[in-house]
Amino acid sequence: MQLTHDIQPEKIEKDRLYLDMGLSDEEFQRIKQILGRHPNFTETGIFSVMWSEHCSYKTSKPLLKKFPTDGPHVLQGPGEGAGVIDIGDEQAVVFKIESHNHPSAVEPYQGAATGVGGIIRDVFSMGARPIASLNSLRFGPLTNNRTKYLFSEVVAGIAGYGNCVGVPTVGGEVQFDESYEDNPLVNAMCVGLINHKDVQKGIAAGIGNTILYAGPPTGRDGIHGATFASDDLAEDSNKDRPAVQVGDPFMEKLLIEACLEVIQSDALVGIQDMGAAGLTSSASEMASKAGTGLEMNLDLVPQREQGMTAYEMMLSESQERMLLCVQAGREQEIIDIFEKYGLKSVPVGKVIEEKVFRIKHLDEVVADIPVDSLADDAPVYNMPSKEAAYYRAFQQMDIATPAIEDYANTLKQLLQQPTIANKEWVYDQYDSMVQTNTVVTPGSDAAVVRIKGTEKALAMTTDCNSRYIYLDPETGGKIAVAEAARNIVCSGAKPLGLTDGLNFGNPTNPEIFWQMEKSVEGMSAACDALHTPVISGNVSLYNQSKGKSIYPTPIVGMVGLHESTQHITPSYFQEKEDVIYCIGEAKAEFGGSELQHLYSGKYEGKAPHIDLDVEAERQEKLLSAIKEGIISSAHDISEGGLAIALAESLFNGQGLGAEINVVGDATVELFSESQSRFLVSVNKKHANAFESHFPEAAKLGKVTDQGQLTISISDKTIIHERVEELENLWKGAIPCLLKSKA
């Protein structure tokens, strides 16, 4: 396809060139009606990216409306670069999650790196200083050589960008499953801190005000990146490498500092990152939100390559670029700030009263489009939904409790499953301590970052067990939100809100859309029950390859507030003689569990049941006990069940052990993944106070200084292992798999 506006408009329709841009026949006819004429090549390209799923949410928008987005502390919900929640003292936390799945499948290093860069820009475009990054990653089995390559390069890309840009990577999650073999998921989250008075919006307001371009020149990288992200991943995906952007973290570091200084000037009206769809999306969205129009001259846009067409400049996704609206006559004030940081900024257009998006190039109008048709008036589709064929069969299955002969060996095998195994190989590559505010580093239930100059801190996590959501999307959606909140509470913080990263297959498949629909309903119910509004998010669809879809993976990024750093609670056992309790009861629930997969190689049956009222009550009571100072450690019981939680609580290098005695069926008690459960340790002087909070909690045993994990069932020892040996297996699993030959 020629990347030029020289192609005659009639030829675009005759040869159906718009199909290659991602537009349907019906959508092209709608564009003709909007314009009252044939669109030219540049206009067709502009519509194609703005009407892509990635930019318009045209199939997911009806579902997103189901999320609760309001709350007493929400200052900015969905609709801007990131959401904003009040944390008191005229301060707020800003956060969002974003996906970079397709680019990471094609060019994993740059795909992951630019995913980090893009989400950081979303946060500082709101006026916030980025203080932490997290990620949520999915790959195929680590026995596959291509998976090893993708895994290694994605982690290297996240580390390469994050470490250089000066924002600590403090947490995240990594899971492995066959459904992600050809379609990895790379979701990046950023958290920022802001004063209320500094909150910005991406608007182009004030007739006659100037549109300013800031950052490096525009090149040909990333053209049609938004469209690429809105289609199935092709088998010959190497041809899509030009759609992957190239990032420069050192440029971004300068851009952060320059923009945060610019934001202090009252000459600034609005600011937005040039993300997906580049100049096209930032300019048209800023005008649409302000109810204005915008005129831009592409001859003024800095260009990295010679002979770039209007089409290429408008659709380029070159990185580290920002678009600003500045008061007319005060442009030089802003230009001078950027120059101080060695960055170029130039006027490229102005705000106009007529609500059109008018683009000029080489003394010719190359696009003249009603601005709202690109944003709020983009098409929205109510997709057909059909219950997945497998779901009813799974619901009717009676999953037997696996018969275990050797409990110690089963524990060892589970500790070496890649999804459970230690992720030190990953997070050791990340700089988690830059900015010197990280209190709880990667590897705990939630990361914790202190707020300088205050007693407060922020807890943050990313969570999603996609196997549960595959088995039962509605129940799995509830569990995803509940587990994220559970992890925040275990750290001693109160959950504030969440950002959602909805990763699904092709929404034109009614069964996939049903997965989306039910997942959102489940998540929404949990958000209501746990008082955690959705303040931002991202949708990534068409995550399938060779006709095979990923498991539905709606990732939850959640942030919580510590009113005092004294309430920060570790996930590891602390001292010998501390009493160990389990809050919540285990049931024979093995559908989607790690034990089920270990013994059968499958995930099938019912997902674990969750009662949201019980979940909310237990979280509230545990948080109250933590604030009273009676909890020594708290750990969420999740993948692998109680046995894994016990082992993980000992893996802190202090030489501690535990003596545990449980009553009931050993397999159920140790390996069930029943929900709403916590493993806590309590100093024995606080045991009575704890039991008054949780009279139903099971007293399991005590912490020892013997370096042994001893588990008995009705006083009969079934596991007696050195903690050091268990920890070595847990830590060595992923490095061992990466070194092995497939």
Curated annotation (Swiss-Prot):
Binding positions (ATP): 57, 96, 500, 537
Keyword annotations of the record: ATP-binding, Cytoplasm, Ligase, Magnesium, Metal-binding, Nucleotide-binding, Purine biosynthesis
Subcellular location: Cytoplasm
Protein EC: 6.3.5.3
Pfam families membership: AIRS, AIRS_C, FGAR-AT_linker
Active site positions: 54, 100
First-tier enzyme category under EC: ligase
Residues engaged in binding Mg(2+) 1: 98, 538
UniProt binding sites for Mg(2+) 2: 122, 273
Residues reported in the UniProt entry to bind substrate: 99-102, 121, 245, 317-319, 540
Gene Ontology, cellular component aspect: cytoplasm
Catalytic activity: N(2)-formyl-N(1)-(5-phospho-beta-D-ribosyl)glycinamide + L-glutamine + ATP + H2O = 2-formamido-N(1)-(5-O-phospho-beta-D-ribosyl)acetamidine + L-glutamate + ADP + phosphate + H(+)
HAMAP family hit by this protein: PurL_2 (MF_00420)
Record protein name field: Phosphoribosylformylglycinamidine synthase subunit PurL
Organism this protein belongs to: Oceanobacillus iheyensis (strain DSM 14371 / CIP 107618 / JCM 11309 / KCTC 3954 / HTE831)
Encoding gene (name): purL
